[in-house]
Amino acid sequence: MRVLLIATYELGHQPLQLAVPAARLRARGHDVRCRDLQVDAWDPELVAWADCVAFSVPMHTATQIARQAIARVRVQRPELPIAGYGLYGEMLDGIADRVIAGETDAALVAWVEGTEELEGADESGIVHLGRDAAAPGAPLPARDLLPPLDRYAHLVIDGTERTVGYVEASHGCAHRCRHCPVPVVYDGRIRIVEHEAVLADIAQQVDAGARHITFGDPDFLNGVHHSVRVVRAMHERFPDVTFDCTVKVEHVLRHDDVWAEFAASGCLFVVSAFESVDDATLTRLDKGHTAADMARSVAVLREHGIAVRPSWMPFTPWTTLDHIRALLEFVAEHGLVGNVDPVHYTIRLLLPRGSLLLDHPEMQAHLDEYDEARGSYRWHAPDPAIDELQQQLAALVEARVAAGDSIPVVSDAVRAAVGLAPLGLAPTAADDVPRLTESWFCCAEPTALQLDAAAAAPVQSARNSSLVAFQPAASVPSIVKNAAPPS
């Protein structure tokens, strides 16, 4: 069988969600080709070649762009079988012929081969939570079928750039934050990726030039003993390789005994979903932390020389102007201006189907109709001025970043827009904070500009993307985001 696997957006990383199923399919004798629309142009000849095509949709942005691409396939090859797989697979139900979520690899192989349904599926047959990833002997992810690492996001540190690899040591999450897409599929469960499989994939990426590894688990400390073991072994084998990971505030504090070893093993920064400084909002989201906990987590990581890169979701149905101001003051007071990509000051809660927030009693008064084109429910703030402020800040950040302004300069512009005095930091004040050239998001709804450009010519190198989602392709996320993974 000639199988075409397509990725549309994976945060600027070389798509693991193509490499793993490609390896499994190839090991079973199938002819597999991959296309990553983050960096590759659309190729109708590949569509003509394929016997079936499957789209990887690990997040909302990827799903929305996949809808555009599927429409192209339907025009060219109406009869071609199409699958959508990944965390957001179910969002393509009715658009793709087969949709799969959760632990998708075995189910995708079964679909390609037309075999019977597998054990581990839910009643819908969509969500699969088998434990294949923990089994030894799986083939190495087929990264040879993907564009080289140097075409993807890089680490910026000390005025230089380093090539970045990407792995996942676990899937799912033990927590059920209401705004996160992960519990919709995993429902508080995690699936461990076999230890040696993770290390072997790291090794092949180091051989390909990676000098930094991103652990893309929804929360790297969900299986803390497993993660420590992986980090320890990676550092023993590759002592010069650095890394970053995503960790929930609650876990930063609970597992504070790991940070000394992580720092000594090359941990440069931790992504953590702070979301809001309003404790009532954090409670509604079931985040499991408070603003005071966030401050403590910054101090814990800093004590070990590890930077924190917070993600924020300032605009929810409960947001007030005072909340926005308090968030900006928190960033300033804790010396985090250079650690926050300015787009995070503009992010608005996204509510896809299945969101655990939909049945929250305090959401009902703000919830509007489902928008099929956006793939999410519309909602409104009680004060229309808050919705207007979000749009104004989004336009401001877009314009400033497009003009090449530095992070401190953009931050001061945002502060001025909400009536706060500028901090007056030097434009270079953020230069010594390690970051990736791709802004970190979980799930973002792309702008109309992105979707139009993706439909016309979906090609843009992630390495050249800006801090915010205003490039004319799928290489960067937009300002409208589902909350980050539980971190």
Tell where the protein language model's regions lie, with residue ranges:
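Glycine-rich beta-alpha loop elements in corrinoid/cobalamin-binding modules
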Residues: 2, 10, 17, 21-142, ...
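Radical SAM enzyme core and accessory elements
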Residues: 2-6, 26-27, 31-34, 46-55, ...
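Residue-level recognition of beta-strand->loop/alpha-helix junctions
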Residues: 7, 36-38, 184, 273, ...
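Active-site beta-loop-alpha junctions enriched in small/polar residues
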Residues: 58, 87, 168, 218-220, ...
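Flexible glycine/acidic-rich beta-alpha junction loops that bind and position SAM and/or redox cofactors
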Residues: 88-92, 175, 224-225, 280-285, ...
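Structural recognition of alpha->loop->beta junctions
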Residues: 92-110, 261-269, 328-347
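Radical SAM [4Fe-4S] cluster-binding motif and immediate context
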Residues: 147-308
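Short, electropositive alpha-helical surface patch
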Residues: 228-235, 320-337
